[in-house]
Amino acid sequence: LTLDETFIAFILTVLNKKQSFIYETKAWRIVMSWIGVCDAEQVQEDFPFSGNVDGKEIGVYLIDGEYYALEDVCPHAYALLSQGFVEDGKVECPLHEAVFDVKTGQCLHGPGGRNLNRYPVRVFENQIQITFVEETVA
């Protein structure tokens, strides 16, 4: 059983107004909550924030006034992407030059091999928060 994009958008709309969300049917249960990653001031254009959230390395980027959160480990070389070069909405792996689109997680060039998971982001009381509905680009 999979969740379609419309339903995920609905959940995120509800969740954006609350701290947590629970949805149950006879077949499945969805429990989502916002998790604090960092303060908004810790993320600057061209200088992303990197942190471990619930055992996952997460990179938070500020691009054109919007925040984006991606898995922070390069799928090819396992380097922290947030330590790479950030320009024009793209991040380059510091080891082998794989390039990813920060807004979508899409691998644009190099040996990355796959797209990155991205995570819904909100700013709540000056704190960057994410939730783990993993979104990947097909």
List each model region and its residues.
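Short cysteine clusters
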Residues: 74, 93-96
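N-terminal amphipathic/basic-hydrophobic helices that include classical n-h-c signal peptides
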Residues: 1-31
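N-terminal pre-ligand scaffold of iron-sulfur
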Residues: 19-88, 102, 115-138
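Short cysteine/histidine-rich metal-coordination sites, predominantly Zn2+-binding motifs
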Residues: 88-94, 107-116
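Short helix-to-coil "ATP-lid" hinge immediately C-terminal to the conserved N-box Asn in the Bergerat
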Residues: 99
